[in-house]
Amino acid sequence: MMPSYTPMIQQYLHIKAQYPDAFLFFRLGDFYEMFFDDAIKAAQELEITLTSRDGGGDERVPMCGVPYHSAQGYIEQLVEKGYKVAICEQVEDPKTAKGVVRREVVQLVTPGTLMEGKGLTEKENHYLATLTPFADSTYGLAYADLSTGEVRLTLLSSWEETGNELHAIGAREIVISSDSAEEWVRELKERYGAAISYEDETWLRDEWSSVAGHVTQEKLRVTVARLLHYLVRTQKRQLDHLQPAELYQVDQYMKMDRHSKLHLELVETVRSKGRKGSLLWLLDETVTAMGGRLLKQWLDRPLIDQRAIERRLDFVETLKTSYFERHELRDRLRDVYDIERLVGRIAYGNANARDLVQLKKSLSQVPSLRQTVSGLPLAEVDELVGRLDPCEELVDLLERAIQEQPPLSIKEGNIIKDGYDERLDRYRDASRNGKAWIAELEAKEREVTGIKSLKVGYNRVFGYYIEVTKPNLPLIPEGRYERKQTLANAERFITAELKEKEALILEAEEKSVELEYELFVAIREQVKEYIPRLQTLAKAIAELDVLQALATVSDERRYVRPQFSTERVLAIEGGRHPVVEKVLGAQTYVPNDCYMNREREMLLITGPNMAGKSTYMRQVALTAIMAQIGCFVPAERAVLPIFDQVFTRIGAADDLSAGQSTFMVEMLEARRAITHATQNSLILFDEIGRGTSTYDGMALAQAMIEYIHDHIGAKTLFSTHYHELTALESSLERLCNVHARAVEENGKVVFLHQIADGPADRSYGIHVAELAGLPISLIERARDILAKLEQSSGNGSLEQGIGEEAGRENGSLMEAASQQQSELELTVGSAADRVVEQSVERQAEHRASAGNEASFEQLSMFPDLAPAPVEPHLSSKEKKALAALKEVNLLEMTPLEALNKLYELQKLLK
């Protein structure tokens, strides 16, 4: 049987039942209260006191609460943790209510619908997305930033493409149909880290024509309708600031999957997941929040339309050379507030008087911006100037109406300027005259009584009063005052005349405050009429800010304007990695050239670790991306094709949460490139195949090189430690060898960080191990082994060379390992042969026809054994390390496991 709760608790339970997945902030006087399970959970999450109250049932009801004036911070905390908060307000005056005060939920705050507070990052969008899958495996995606009013809409051809878009926008909340499969819901939560919500209404209302009236395709109409229904249902108001939905296709921009963006560190670094150290960090010379958000959007979606790119470059070049005008623009833009989000607050009815002052100050900069831009020597400035709308009438309204330094609250008065409204002026005169009368009264009473310390004061409990200290009480004429309050050291009195004047003053002040609030709300409604113009202005200012930012960084870092080739030529002279150069300094960084054309489509890069291969590959990709967003590039000269896609496989990071090893991740990322790349794409593959055995890895690497060369024709930079692959240059006509240079000086290796034509002759792996701090005796032993191997390689007896170095005493271990290697080769052979059978046959034919005797034989790790030389004297620690090293089975180790083993050995020797 249900407990007999009080009417107020029954009201709470009735409303809570409508929002079971949200915390219900239930307004009671000056507090938002929570009850039952909400109270218990909120007390834990917000670290506030859990108490209880009598709710009419058998047991006391758990309760906690927060003051209404500080509730926003608590709401943000819950939303940041992925919760929703339903805000339930009193919607009638408690003084006139009969029974329980009527209450309604006025807004449902969700992770994707934050409008203000610390949960919004200044230079990042805060997107809510809706996703609709269709039977033909296409997906409708609509997303909006409620704080700015932006709405975007697209149709995607595959789940992979959809995933890339979801990662690019970083949606905080994804809205889907309630009948979605549980497995799909779980994947959305885990892979994209977004809160999941549900909405089933997918019909477009007539009043949404300004947002979606131009959307004609049914799939897109269904998708955007789901978004709008969810927004209206949760926000419970008209969303007048939502802009017309921008329809786009991903094919209109350079495509990069999330892995490529992460490998290239476009907006965040691999290690810290932070902005510092990324390309965005380098380029962000914007001085407005709007410009910062737009720059990230440009970087996420580089252009592929050459005319659009050249228009941006023209503007950047003009600003780059117009030094004084650019600095004038930067100074003016610094005084522009976030107009986009100010407009959102105005539309929501959340804007206070300080917001309107910020809007006025921002608009006051527009005439100067127009004048400066108009003076630039560029024909295209007229279009931008036309969008820089100064909204003079609005500035005049705000200048006449709003105080320069108004209070934060809009219900405490002192917002509206004198002279704006006659009624308000009359109330203010009455209040001011009354206060002048009070001052005169105080002076008169001091003179009559002779009490110099007598004063007239005020508090909200007793109103106005006359205060006299106790030593002066005998000086008061009999019957002059009426005693009101006794204090420790004084008495307070009133008079009939004082109370009469008090009533007039307080009435004037009360009516003045009420009228100011009404006037402010009316002014805010007038400002709403300017929302479309303000949004157009905000976009123009954001674009101007991004262009000046690109011009600033291009000027300060000595970048050059890229040229574009229709002949698929890539010619970079003196190219630099923009971020590495900034970190190291221009004097330290070593620039490199890169040349590719139709006859030179692939560069096979060899050379030692730490020599700069990966940096070289990344700088080529970053140069292309910077060029296609309309920025100058870090080089002495750059001619580039326009790339439709960029694919990368750089670095190794196990996806443990998905149960994927380094090698599986490597193969999946390689598959994306091989499946989707075109001859207009750019592919960067760094040491493909290192996550598996040597033969497997080399076979796959060679097969991939041949496949890209023969079937795709994309510009490709392929680095490898399989030096045997360099012989492919003779059989693949569009492949060229290049290498990262290194030299030895006095037995030490020096990495020159220069890329030169031809294959590398050595890997210098032992030198890298020495730099890592491995024991000297171990390093010397490795050098001896290497010398024997190189000598044996020259005599055609590699196995014998390794055997001589291994020694008799390890015979049993090595024989067992040799047997294991033989068995492994049988297993690998059948699999690898299937992968590369045709490629190997084709290569053999090429070699036969060319008379090429180059051998592709890989060094055997476990050859026949021979007598060992005399062992050098080793310490006990070194013997333990050597014994541990001999037990290592390299064939079954990933690179990460090998690195961990080296670390263990290093610790053992310390």
UniProtKB/Swiss-Prot annotation:
One of its GO terms (biological process) is mismatch repair. Keywords: ATP-binding, DNA damage, DNA repair, DNA-binding, Nucleotide-binding. ATP binds at G607, P608, N609, M610, A611, G612, K613, S614. GO terms for cellular component: cytosol. It comes from the Bacteria. InterPro entries: DNA_mismatch_repair_MutS (IPR005748), DNA_mismatch_repair_MutS-lik_N (IPR007695), DNA_mismatch_repair_MutS/MSH (IPR017261), DNA_mismatch_repair_MutS_C (IPR000432), DNA_mismatch_repair_MutS_clamp (IPR007861), DNA_mismatch_repair_MutS_core (IPR007696), DNA_mismatch_repair_MutS_N (IPR016151), DNA_mismatch_repair_MutS_sf (IPR036187). GO terms for molecular function: ATP binding; ATP-dependent DNA damage sensor activity; damaged DNA binding; mismatched DNA binding. Belongs to the DNA mismatch repair MutS family. NCBIfam families: mutS1, PRK05399.1. This protein is involved in the repair of mismatches in DNA. It is possible that it carries out the mismatch recognition step. This protein has a weak ATPase activity. This is DNA mismatch repair protein MutS. It comes from Geobacillus thermodenitrificans (strain NG80-2).
